[in-house]
Amino acid sequence: MSGNNSNDLAQGLKQRHVTMLSIAGVIGAGLFVGSGHAIAAAGPAVLLAYAAAGTLVVLVMRMLGEMAIASPDTGSFSTYADRAIGRWAGFTIGWLYWWFWVLVIPLEANAAAAILHAWFPSVDLWAFSLLITLALTLTNLCSVKNYGEFEFWFALLKVLAIIGFIVVGCIAMFGFVPSSQVSGASHLFDTQGFMPNGLGAVLAAMLTTMFSFMGTEIVTIAAAESKDPGKQISRATNSVIWRICLFYLVSIFLVVALVPWNDPALAEVGSYQTVLSRIGVPNAKLIVDIVVLVAVTSCLNSALYTSSRMLFSLSKRGDAPAIAQRTTKAATPHVAVLLSTAAAFLCVFANYVAPAQVFEFLLASSGAIALLVYLVIAVSQLRMRSQREARGEKIAFKMWLFPGLTWATIAFIVAVLAVMALREDHRAEIIATALLSIGVVAAGLLVHRKREAAGKVALDN
């Protein structure tokens, strides 16, 4: 079975592309650099924050897997929300998700450009940013195979980097590196205990870490452009547990075991660079910079791919301009790619010409979109599963302990959103995301009413 929205696109992704994408889809710059801020806030108890956020992602991916295996579709959860909840839900979450990845494009381009500018200071920052964005846009315009090939090698480098870090970290922890400044695991408890800043700090860290997992769901979008999407999605969903445990929990455990959580370097230069420097690895900064460059370039590549596919899917359903449906001879949605890139450039332009508050609002508006996506996936699975069971369909891939665990997941997401609204450091994100969501819902209702009215007029004539 395959969804309607994926039929017009090429099935150019090979098994190794989807496999590597699923393995490394959760690895971003947030792990290599951003995790240092979470550790500095929560101490060793940040492990609990990552475990809680990781558990949520595992449950959401299981729900998404149940729907995607039954009906693979380029629109993924947006299409399922359309079917299970209503047109307004699919319209809203589809556009919010597109907006999230459009914002990611300039942010990741600037992050990559900053690293390259540090190596080659004679070249302006904007030139590197423009060059990287245009190069990856051209790559995505050619064929989906190009995206898959780039992501395969990006993902392989990220995986090798983490495995290398874990191996070096374990060797140092067991005292087999004579030149190392750190060894053992005493820092888990010897600096004001395991939870030095209390449960509130762990909760705050969980809110931060939760967004580092955004991108896990991309495999369900990409798999629709492979020859056996159901099989690919099943593999990706079943492997998400060990991926999160290995890449996040094990690597973060090594960081908090080897380095005191209150070491200023964690927040200043990042967790990986701090640990490698303390172990005595030569050129630790250069090594981490290369890995981060690969990670942010990979994220930029995925942002271009994901935003274009979501826009294409919205267009196929009549929820976006019809021109976004157009494809090349290689069955690539080139107009959707160009429109997404153009929107990203408009965001950059707004940063320069609009008041600072405008761009701050644009950034804040994406703050809670990840949680809204997870919430929509859970509600869609709850309703779609009930609908399928009522029709007597055989469900090959099931969410565990349905419906109890689905309801528990929904309650947890709502609770996290409520906590974000109560905390001053996250309230702006909730307000901005809520305002944007209301605007998108209103636009969707207006579009659908006009379409229904036009349809009635056509029937009357």
Model-derived segments and their meaning:
Residues 3-9, 46-47, 121-124, 156-289:
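Helix-loop-helix junctions that connect adjacent transmembrane segments
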Residues 73, 96-110, 213-226, 248, ...:
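Membrane-helix boundary/coupling elements in multi-pass transport proteins
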Residues 10, 23, 33-128, 132, ...:
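Extracellular loop-to-transmembrane helix junctions
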Residues 153-154, 323-334, 371-428, 460-461:
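C-terminal membrane-solvent junction of multi-pass transporters and transport-like membrane proteins
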Residues 126-183, 214, 237-241, 363-376, ...:
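Membrane-interface loop-to-helix entry segments
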Residues 79-81, 86, 118, 205, ...:
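TM-loop-TM module centered on a large, flexible mid-protein loop between adjacent transmembrane helices
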Residues 139, 161-165, 311, 364-395, ...:
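Hydrophobic alpha-helical segments of multi-pass membrane transport proteins
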Residues 1-35, 40-45, 58-62, 74, ...:
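Membrane-interface "cap" regions at the ends of multi-pass membrane proteins
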